[in-house]
Regions:
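His/Asp/Glu-rich metal-coordinating catalytic cores
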Residues: 1-59, 64-69, 74, 81
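C-terminal functional module detector
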Residues: 69-96
Length: 96
């Protein structure tokens, strides 16, 4: 990260938890997240909110505004705040 600048990155794929087998397409490994060199990594592909932050990198699957598959109308999104005093924070917002 560069002082006085926010580095935000986007990635699309499956986060690889320790218990996962290497059978998913587009794996994102924990060390790749930790080494991303950004303040916030916005992740996509999953339709639910999951925080997979590693090291100093905040990494979050945002959820889906339409709701998870099979649960239409129960959506949520992630609102991210980048504050020079407090760093990266986020909150989930329900979409009705």
């Amino acid at each position: 990260p560069v002082e006085n600048n926010w580095l935000v990155a986007l990635a699309h794929g499956h986060f690889h938890f320790a218990e996962d087998r290497d059978q998913r397409s587009s794996p994102i490994y924990p060390q790749e997240v930790a080494d991303a060199g950004c303040h916030y990594l916005a992740l996509g592909h999953w339709d639910r909110h999951v925080d997979v932050s590693q090291g100093s990198v905040t990494a979050v699957y945002s959820g889906c505004p339409l709701g998870p598959i099979g649960s239409p109308g129960a959506g949520e999104v992630t609102v991210v705040d980048l504050d020079p005093q407090t760093g990266v924070s986020y909150r989930q917002v329900a979409i009705n």
